Amino acid sequence: MKKNRLLFRVIILLILSGAVGFTLYQGFFADKEKMQIGKEAPNFVVTDLEGKKIELKDLKGKGVFLNFWGTWCKPCEKEMPYMNELYPKYKEKGVEIIALDADETDIAVKNFVNQYGLKFPVAIDKGQKIIGTYGVGPLPTSFLIDKDGKVVEQIIGEQTKEQLEGYLKKITP
């Protein structure tokens, strides 16, 4: 009985130590890698859930709202319907919304997209390479990229519909 309790405590301690260590590691390196406002957004190539290739450099001339999210993320879930509602209006004005999932299974992401009827391009960041390049920490995190391919702003956290629309206006060409 005492051995089981001791083993349980050691396991919990190891898990907590690992979580704290990971958090400190992420915080330390995220500051070094953080995307710089006013600089060119790093190019990336992904394939969306429809099988269409998306390359950031091909979107020059358009504003890009780049959103990093996860199906398990409640704030992400709350803001997705706003993005979906505003997408057609701003697509006509030259703004593209791209949602990059944080390396979950295809089935989980497809189910989420179908559940919410998302119309904008959604892709999965396999291996979290793009997340690493952009220095993303907590989800949701979004980047505003102007028509010249420069990062205008980084937004961390959930957005209201009004905030989101303000950001989309900001990058409308």
Swiss-Prot record:
UniProt domain Thioredoxin: residue ranges: 35-173
Source domain of life: Bacteria
Entry-linked Pfam families: AhpC-TSA
Molecular function terms from GO: antioxidant activity; disulfide oxidoreductase activity
Pathway membership, UniProt: Protein modification; cytochrome c assembly
Purpose of the protein: Thiol-disulfide oxidoreductase which is required in disulfide reduction during c-type cytochrome synthesis. May accept reducing equivalents from CcdA, leading to breakage of disulfide bonds in apocytochrome c; following this reduction heme can be covalently attached.
Protein name according to UniProt: Thiol-disulfide oxidoreductase ResA
Species for this entry: Bacillus anthracis
Taxonomic placement: Bacteria, Bacillati, Bacillota, Bacilli, Bacillales
